[in-house]
């Protein structure tokens, strides 16, 4: 039910380095890292990559590049509107003519919010922060479309379980964050709604072990799970399971042929690509 392909290396996985002149820097120039690239094909439009620039998360600014020829050539980088970061880790979705980008901030406490555009990405608005119980911190949401028409977003948390929030107005407002039964060890995840209405989640489905000081568990195993409602998840397949290292920051999409494509960091050395056949998915 799966095939795999290793590609590139850890250095390439970090993305390009952008040189920016910094005032009062005696050397004149300072190298700034690019973070969390998100590539997205706007239906009927450009192929875009959203990313962040900054030496630390608190200094992030949002940027993008675009391609009009399927990725062969790219524009110069463009800054996003001040105060907007774009999708923070996971892909946007297009729903009823609206692009909705899942995002979050870490400065001043982990908080989810969403940015949305009604003109295919030309201009953007943003939501309020998603409310949560005291002590529940969440980042890096992934959006699903439920069968009843609502949107749901699952998110990484520090609370040993995946968080979920809902929208009934196409992404303008979101419900208070709830914790579901599926474990999360403070590691990135992604989700996608399939053409048949089911949802698929890729994540490290283990709780944070007791006694861990930094609040992060081992990012292994890496599992793929399936759900009918976005809340109750069934294990489908384990992609990786080794204590040697970690398998992290996964992304998942469904292509036009129905196949699922998973990409993730393999032991902090390479990027791995795995293709899954949903026809072999057992209910």
Describe these PLM feature segments.
Residues 1-283:
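Asp-box/BNR beta-propeller blade signature and adjacent active/binding-site loops
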């Amino acid at each position: 039910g799966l095939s795999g392909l290793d590609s590139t290396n850890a250095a390439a996985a970090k993305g390009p380095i952008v040189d920016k002149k910094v005032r009062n820097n005696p050397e004149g120039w300072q190298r700034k890292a690019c973070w969390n690239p998100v590539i997205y094909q706007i239906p009927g439009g450009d192929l875009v990559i959203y990313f962040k620039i900054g030496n630390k998360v608190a200094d992030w600014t949002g940027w993008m590049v675009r391609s009009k020829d399927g990725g062969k050539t790219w524009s110069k980088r463009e800054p996003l509107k001040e105060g907007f970061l774009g999708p923070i880790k996971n892909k946007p979705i297009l729903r009823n003519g609206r692009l909705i980008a899942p995002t979050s901030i870490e400065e001043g406490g982990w908080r989810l919010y969403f940015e949305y555009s009604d003109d295919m990405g030309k201009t953007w608005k943003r939501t309020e922060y998603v409310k949560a119980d005291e002590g529940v911190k969440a980042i890096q949401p992934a959006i699903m479309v439920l069968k009843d028409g609502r949107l749901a977003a699952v998110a990484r948390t520090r609370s040993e379980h995946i968080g979920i929030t809902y929208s009934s107005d196409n992404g303008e407002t979101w419900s208070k964050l709830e914790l579901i039964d599926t474990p999360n060890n403070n590691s990135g995840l992604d989700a996608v709604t399939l053409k048949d209405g089911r949802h698929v989640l890729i994540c490290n489905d283990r709780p944070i072990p007791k006694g861990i000081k930094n609040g992060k568990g081992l990012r292994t195993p890496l599992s793929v799970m399936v759900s009918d409602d976005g809340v109750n998840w069934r294990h489908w397949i384990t992609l990786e399971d080794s204590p040697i290292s970690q398998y992290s920051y996964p992304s998942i999409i469904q292509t036009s042929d129905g196949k699922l494509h998973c990409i993730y960091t393999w032991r902090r050395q390479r990027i791995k690509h795995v293709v899954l056949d949903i026809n072999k998915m057992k209910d």
